[in-house]
């Protein structure tokens, strides 16, 4: 059955440009301007921190030292789906580069709340990302990343099922269910290449505040609803040391240490 997880500790970790994403509430983030994705199967705790017992997914954005230019993506679809992305990659010298990117994504949805007339599953999300990369010497590399994302989406567009006809009615609730989230992830990574080993230090901070509202009676009458709020701050520190030459021609050694501190306040009915 594999390795399971409970509460906010997933069994498979996510990293963005070397920055760990701690909470599962941060996993459904918008991915854009990616350079590559690595999927590592099996336990990865030797070189990575918590939540990597079952594997690891590493996402990498474009490095401004390797890629320069301006990218703009526009998209329009049914139900007034709209998508805008932009990114600028600048290389100021052979040793310093910067990238600045942003996006907006939204759709009106497929269902309408009969009670309020509002779109029951519309959503809007937006965000921006700043990345600074410096390589002052051939041995030292510095990387700073700041990624902010905002989500505001209506949800849970459930309707009554007519067992005789097999048709489902449109949602009809007095409270519009939905989810809102503000999330900021930042990280600073220092890399050093020695003659026989590579050393990496990553310090990260994550801020997350969200609010989920559910109309649990799914009726126009106000019988039952649920509201959950989360407020989270987390910091991590990782050190990794890897040999860059095989010992005895076959053994590649590696080890690392990891520290994290998470403060989470949840306001929810139990």
Report each predicted region and the residues it spans.
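Extracytoplasmic beta-strand/coil segments of soluble accessory domains associated
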Residues: 1-19, 35
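Short beta-turn/strand-loop junction motif enriched in small, turn-promoting residues
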Residues: 3, 43-45, 244
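Non-cytosolic beta-sheet module surface loops
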Residues: 4, 76-78, 205
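Outer-membrane beta-barrel translocator/receptor signature
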Residues: 10-11, 23, 32-35, 41, ...
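Short, flexible loop segments at the rims of nucleotide/cofactor-binding pockets, characterized by
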Residues: 15-17, 77, 176-178
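Outer-membrane beta-barrel domain signature, strongest for Gram-negative TonB-dependent receptors
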Residues: 95, 117, 121-264
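Short, intrinsically disordered, charge-balanced linker/junction segments flanking boundaries
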Residues: 265-270
């Amino acid at each position: 059955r594999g390795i399971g997880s409970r509460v906010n500790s997933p069994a498979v970790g996510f990293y963005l440009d070397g920055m760990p994403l701690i909470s599962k509430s941060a996993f459904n983030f918008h991915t854009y301007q990616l350079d590559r994705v690595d999927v590592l199967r099996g336990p990865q705790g030797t070189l990575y921190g918590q939540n990597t017992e079952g594997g690891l997914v590493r996402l990498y954005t474009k490095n401004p030292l390797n890629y320069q230019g301006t990218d703009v993506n526009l998209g329009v679809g049914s139900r007034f789906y709209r998508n805008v992305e932009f990114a600028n990659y600048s290389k100021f010298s052979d040793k310093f580069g910067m990238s600045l990117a942003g996006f907006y994504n939204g759709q009106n949805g497929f269902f309408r709340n009969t009670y309020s007339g509002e779109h029951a599953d519309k959503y809007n999300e937006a965000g921006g990302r700043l990345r600074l990369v410096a390589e002052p010497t051939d041995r030292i590399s510095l990387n700073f990343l700041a990624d902010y994302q905002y989500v505001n989406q209506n949800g849970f567009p459930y309707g009554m099922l007519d067992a005789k006809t097999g048709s489902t009615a449109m949602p009809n609730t007095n409270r519009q269910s939905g989810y809102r989230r503000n999330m900021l992830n930042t990280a600073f990574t220092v890399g050093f290449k020695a003659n026989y080993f590579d050393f990496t230090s990553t310090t990260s901070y994550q801020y997350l505040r969200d609010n989920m509202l559910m109309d649990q009676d799914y009726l126009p009458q106000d019988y039952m609803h649920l509201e959950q709020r989360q407020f989270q701050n987390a910091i991590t520190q990782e050190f990794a040391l890897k040999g860059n030459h095989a010992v005895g021609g076959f053994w590649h050694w590696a080890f690392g240490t990891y520290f994290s501190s998470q403060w989470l306040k949840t306001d929810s009915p139990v």
